[in-house]
Amino acid sequence: MPNTDVSSLSMLGQQTETAQSPEEAVLEKVPSNHAGTDYVVRFTAPEFTSLCPMTGQPDFAHIVIDYIPGEWLVESKSLKLFLHSFRNHGAFHEDCSIYIAKRIVELLDPRWLRIGAYWYPRGGIPIDVFWQTGKPPEGVWLPEQGVATYRGRG
């Protein structure tokens, strides 16, 4: 029988304010009903925003997070609010990208995780950041992230 106990969740089904910083943001988890089965969960945030730590100008990215759960799944509303907490946060692209991945790994201890952060150009240069916890388990269907390389007018 599926584990549907959501009593520990504080945000799902509630009106929730966005944290003022990623450090303050709460990520929540729910039990996986399929622990022991290798499958990929994908979250896509095509309109992620943060601020340049030097100029305060907005930075935009298309972020794709893939993970193979262990015992836990990330609760999606808490992830959405966590990502939104970067909106007024000043950090370099690389720091935002790796921080997101490491917070999820710390919360879930997944079998495997990768992040692809495709940042839109600032100063004429797009920056893409890729990180993963190691090799994925064999035999898992792992789709391409499907985000085209930035081409401008090329």
Curated annotation (Swiss-Prot):
Its main location: cytoplasm. The active site is at residues 52, 59. Pfam families: QueF. Its EC number is 1.7.1.13. The keyword Repeat does not apply. Residues 1-21 have a biased composition (Polar residues). SUPFAM superfamilies: Tetrahydrobiopterin biosynthesis enzymes-like (SSF55620). Substrate binds at residues 74-76, 93-94. GO terms for molecular function: preQ1 synthase activity. One of its GO terms (cellular component) is cytoplasm. InterPro entries: GTP-CH-I_C/QueF (IPR043133), NADPH_dep_7-cyano-7-deazaG_red (IPR050084), QueF (IPR029500), QueF_type1 (IPR016856). It comes from the Bacteria. It is an enzyme of class 1 (oxidoreductase). It is found in: Cytoplasm. Keywords: Cytoplasm, NADP, Oxidoreductase, Queuosine biosynthesis. One of its GO terms (biological process) is tRNA modification. It catalyses: 7-aminomethyl-7-carbaguanine + 2 NADP(+) = 7-cyano-7-deazaguanine + 2 NADPH + 3 H(+). The keyword Magnesium does not apply. Pathway: tRNA modification; tRNA-queuosine biosynthesis. Residues 1-28 are annotated as: Disordered. Belongs to the GTP cyclohydrolase I family. QueF type 1 subfamily. Catalyzes the NADPH-dependent reduction of 7-cyano-7-deazaguanine (preQ0) to 7-aminomethyl-7-deazaguanine (preQ1). HAMAP family: QueF_type1. This is NADPH-dependent 7-cyano-7-deazaguanine reductase. It comes from Rhizobium johnstonii (strain DSM 114642 / LMG 32736 / 3841). The gene is queF.
